[in-house]
Amino acid sequence: MADFHEFYPLRRHNTFGFDVRARYASHIRSEADLLAALNDPRAVGLPLVVLGGGSNVVLTGDLDALVLLMEIPGFRVGTAPDAWLVTAGAGENWHGLVCRTIAEGLPGLENLALIPGTVGAAPIQNIGAYGVELRERFASVRALDRQTMRFVDLDLEQCAFSYRDSLFKQAGRDRYIITAVTLRLSRDWQPVLAYGELAREVEGNAAPDAAAIRDAVIAIRSRKLPDPAQIGNAGSFFKNPLVSAEQRDVLLASHPDLVSYAQPDGSFKLAAGWLIDRCGFKGLNDGPVGVYGKQALVLVHHGGGTGAALLALAGRIADTVQARFGVRIEPEPVVL
């Protein structure tokens, strides 16, 4: 029999700190644990929810489900002619992995430092920050295919990554459970400093190494984002919307200080934080939930609130942005 806990509290398993419970929860520390949990008779007929760090989820109420608490460890380094292949268990802490690879002389993940959550969640969201996305460092994932109950390896193309999206949020959402991730870190490392704020942070360092860039990213994120241990949050709550060059030019004509970033395909990514700030939401408190005073992209939970209240605020923000700018901003977290 698997290790099941009934009516298990999830407040410490979601970074918003919403006080909800799971019908059953099971700690998954190996692939054998995963198979045992899925084959347990108590799991029959129950929906399945996989939680890592709970840093990209909004829990709106108690879950009448089996919650798998992903805690599979592991770290190993392989080689390819032009790269190191780093494989980590899905339960490893993401920032811990970034720091470990740098400490072992394997640069490439430094721009993704201090992103909360676990390794297994990183491909689901195609995490990204300061000019780097996970897909640019990705080799493969190992996952359980629930249709066949066999473990499979999925490569870059199969994972269908796009901006904050992947196979695992679309057609494969209920099919695959990630147990390990393999990253490809080039031996020909070059710093990525195209993001203006990061470049300014390392000014004065003529040749910043990966550790210096990681430290700069940590400094920037620490200034802008609240610590979930102090204030409940999931980091950036909204995606930066993509618009055509024509739509961006129309907006720029009436808003000369609009913040936007050109994309390789000719479209533009608008800074959602700027849009929200211009609508007057930055620093707003709406009872136990609100908008962080230092970064309008971040929604916060001060305690005693609900996921439903947070989503109501998010909807209000999105509606206001659309009414003013004609652009719809979408949430990043998964809603359960």
UniProtKB/Swiss-Prot annotation:
InterPro entries, alphabetized: FAD-bd_PCMH (IPR016166), FAD-bd_PCMH-like_sf (IPR036318), FAD-bd_PCMH_sub1 (IPR016167), FAD-bd_PCMH_sub2 (IPR016169), MurB (IPR003170), MurB_C (IPR011601), MurB_C_sf (IPR036635), Oxid_FAD_bind_N (IPR006094)
Record-listed E.C. numbers: 1.3.1.98
Pathway participation: Cell wall biogenesis; peptidoglycan biosynthesis
Cofactor: FAD
Span of domain FAD-binding PCMH-type: 17-188
Chain segments annotated as coiled-coil in the UniProt record: none
Primary localization class, coarse: cytoplasm
One Gene Ontology CC term in the entry: cytosol
A GO BP annotation: regulation of cell shape
Catalytic reaction(s) noted: UDP-N-acetyl-alpha-D-muramate + NADP(+) = UDP-N-acetyl-3-O-(1-carboxyvinyl)-alpha-D-glucosamine + NADPH + H(+)
Active site annotation, chain numbering: R164, S236 (proton donor), E332
Cellular compartment(s): Cytoplasm
Pfam families (alphabetical): FAD_binding_4 (PF01565), MurB_C (PF02873)
Keywords, ordered alphabetically: Cell cycle, Cell division, Cell shape, Cell wall biogenesis/degradation, Cytoplasm, FAD, Flavoprotein, NADP, Oxidoreductase, Peptidoglycan synthesis
GO molecular function: FAD binding; UDP-N-acetylmuramate dehydrogenase activity
Family (UniProt): Belongs to the MurB family.
Protein function: Cell wall formation.
Protein name: UDP-N-acetylenolpyruvoylglucosamine reductase
